Amino acid sequence: MKLSKNFSLKELTASHTAERKGINNNPNDDQITALQKLCENILQPVRDHYASPVTVSSGFRSEELCVAIGSSVNSQHAKGQAADFEIFGVPNAELAKWIIENLDYDQLILEFHKTDEPNSGWIHCSYKSPSDNRKSTLRAFRNDQGKTQYEEYKPE
């Protein structure tokens, strides 16, 4: 099933962990609708702008999959509203900046990016609806104790 011109349901539900553990990672109709909105408003515009494939490392996650990987069952991934992705050859800070400046999103997190390693980390981006999007923009990093921390992110 196509969610947009270049994105399929199979691509947004793919999970090695789900396959390995025999977990059903099939979304319901509401979650599929949310995935379509995510593709139409975030992933497809990114793909069109850069004219390069977008590699989705994590899209939809069923509740059972969330539990298996230690994620919250209330995460936006479980609602079909979020994806983690990157474009090989495009620095993730550049990709984040373009999204921030050009798209309406709910939350964008530049995850585990290191300024001295332009291709490090990835983008987490979610989409709800024009009236519900918060435009929350964060950076995730590991503190000195190895725990994940978040702080407001403003691109340079």
Model-derived features with residue positions:
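Structural recognition of the beta-strand scaffold that forms the well-ordered cores
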Residues: 55-57, 82-86, 124
